[in-house]
Amino acid sequence: MLLFYVVRQKRDLEASYRKLYDINRSHVETGEKKAPRATNLLKEDQKQLLLDGIRRVMEETDEYCQPEFTVATLAKLIDSNERYVSMVVNDHFGKSFTEVLNDYRIKKACERLTTNNAKYAQLTIAAIGQSVGYKSQTTFVKQFRKCTGLTPSVYQKFVAEDRRNKETGS
């Protein structure tokens, strides 16, 4: 009787993890974000220029994967100041710069965990974390779980399972 209960709990947990994985894959693919908040210190055209610069750096480069990447680094890359960059990030994403940075890093980690690229396919979870800017595996796992609801190893397990299913045509 106890064995039946344990097996059922494990199956239910696996099903919950699968749902979280599927949800997170769709978020990674669509790039969903929270609703913006309003700020009046910058003109709309200034906000848009800053936002375009922020997006360019965060989406077209891997600069944010550097462990020492900060709001000051981002501001310097887009020729602005920290305060304005921080305000635009808070306004557009509805999150702090650190939260947005972690979101981008975890999204990149998910991409690297799902890629068939030989460069990343053989890396350990700690190495994937380092490749996206985390100095500590513990911090990486904590942030990964906070963003996705799964640990990197569980996520990787589902990626492998999806690959096997695609190969067998299931």
Feature roles, as predicted:
Residues 140:
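Binding-interface segments
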Residues 4-127, 131, 143-146, 153-154, ...:
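Membrane-proximal linker segments that couple transmembrane helices to downstream signaling/catalytic modules
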